[in-house]
Amino acid sequence: MRDPVRTLIAGCVLLVGVTACTGGSTATEPVLNVYNWSDYVAPGVIDDFEREYGIKVNYDVFDSNEVLETKMLMGHSNFDVVVPSGPFLQRQITAGVYRKLDKSLLPNLKYADQEVARESAVYNPGNEYGVDYMWITSGPGYNVARIRERMPDAPVDSLRMIFDPQVVAKFADCGVAILDTPTEMLGAVLMYLGRNPNSESLADLKAAESALMAIRPYIRYVHSSRYIDDLANGEICLAMGWSGDVKQAHDRALEAGRGIELAYHIPREGAIRNFDLVAIPADAPHLKNAHLFINFLLRPDIAARNSNVLKYANGDDPSFEHLNSAVSGDPGIYPPLPVRAKLVPELAKTSQFTRLLNRMWTRFKTGE
């Protein structure tokens, strides 16, 4: 989710595995191995942690929960800190992937937004295994001028922008992208169809596949991070993306002086709301360092720095006073209560349904 990190990755970027850089680990060495989403930490945050604690951070990135889950279920990843989304954390807790947090080592939990913690506890009973990092929505992000040229009355605040074939077809020539996240996109298309976004009904799955196949000819690609730069560069004009990613793309376009205006709306039908949490794998080699890092992320000034750059709402209550007004006052990041009431948390799926969903998603991606 979510590339400042491309320009600041601390330590060595891992291509094969963390051990390729660490050469073996011990619990006492000043090392921390982090596996996080791309585009998901503000510039300087990792450097500041390294300077403050004298700990070398090896930082690797992924761009889908499915990639993270594969590594976690295999075990022996050598990662100390990972950032799964709520439903995946929930399922992986059941599989014994994570260890309970030692809250005595996390004094900054006192800053946690209790409302956010209550909402994310559906994935994380008692908030024992994960700490809220960011919460996000997904919806249409678009190039204002190009959309207006092709459809002056485009329903820019609606899921119709993506899932109505008669609408999305108008933008195929300027490029449309969609997130490569089968569970979240299933929820979004079911919401568009007026169905339960967390349904595991086979009838709903078939209806969702029909709706997705109807728009497939108009989708240029399916990817969870490429669209950020492509929106900023004008390579595409519409993406079903994460709120903060679209806003990061907007900032990049402004910084580059390209004259590209991008916008994001939480769909009026509602949106999938997801929580990303920081967790510690059961076999993490550097437990103390992992807790130090999580506690560092919970500092209000650090949480605000991340939100100010990433354009996502964080789970840290006092950080609000440190936020830029452009972030704290943006309804696409911190929506008003009536909009927030329409946000639906994505729930974990059974393994049997997940297999069916993944097969359907493969058919959608390949167009077959």
Model-found features: residue ranges?
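Short, low-complexity disordered leader/linker segments with a strong preference
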Residues: 1-31
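Early extracytoplasmic/lumenal segment of secretory-pathway proteins
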Residues: 24-95
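Extracytoplasmic ligand-binding site segments that recognize negatively charged/polar headgroups
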Residues: 83-218, 225-232
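A ligand-binding cleft/hinge motif common to bilobed small-molecule-binding domains
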Residues: 88-91, 238-259
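A bilobed periplasmic-binding-protein/Venus flytrap-type ligand-binding module shared by bacterial periplasmic
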Residues: 141-146, 191-194, 274-286, 305
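Periplasmic-binding protein-like
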Residues: 205-214, 220, 258-282
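Conserved C-terminal helix/tail region of periplasmic/extracytoplasmic solute-binding proteins
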Residues: 229, 337-368
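Mature extracytoplasmic/periplasmic domains
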Residues: 281-342
